[in-house]
Amino acid sequence: GMRVIPLIIAEEKLDAAKAAAGEEPLLELRPWVRKTAAIVATGSEVKKGLIQDTFTPVVRDKLAAYGIETLSVTYPGDGVENVANAVAEARQTGAEVILCTGGMSVDPDDNTPGGIKQSGARIVTYGAPVLPGAMFLLGYYDDGTPVMGLPGCVMYAGATIFDLVLPWVAADVPVTRDWIVSLGEGGLCLGCKPCHWPACPFGK
């Protein structure tokens, strides 16, 4: 509603305001739904133990902030088949959100997008007009389970495309390609130090 300033106002003006507002509410609050997640940490170096997995702890913490419990973490290495099989196994755990880390760039051995597609997901977008996070992937399975391919920036940047999408996923609101495209306005993080997100223009 809106406060009417004058003591008296013509009724037709109130009727016009109601008509302009329409039947739908101007704002809708959707609660976060307690969910479970599975993380597929790709990359042969991580699987072989040549480098430490510093990506998973970051993702796990971001999920926990929304009450999302991580059920499993797997290390399939590289290769489209390996990633696809790992995603299929992650789905079998009953996880309601699937997250793949690493292998999202354009290098020849970056096979995560292909693995996600081969696993049967309907790809909503591979790429986003957002920095950090341009190489983000989002898809859905037929049962509504979301799957995301997270670019490396999620590991070290204060706020990324993942931080913009995750609240919607946590509230069970389907994320569309049109909405991802709309993030192009306000989609450049200025990298402020210290980071004040979400109290900043990023993603708004």
Which residue stretches match the model-derived regions?
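Short, glycine/charged-enriched hinge/interface segments at domain edges or termini
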Residues: 1-71, 75
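Short glycine/threonine-rich loop/turn motifs
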Residues: 44, 50, 54, 68-203
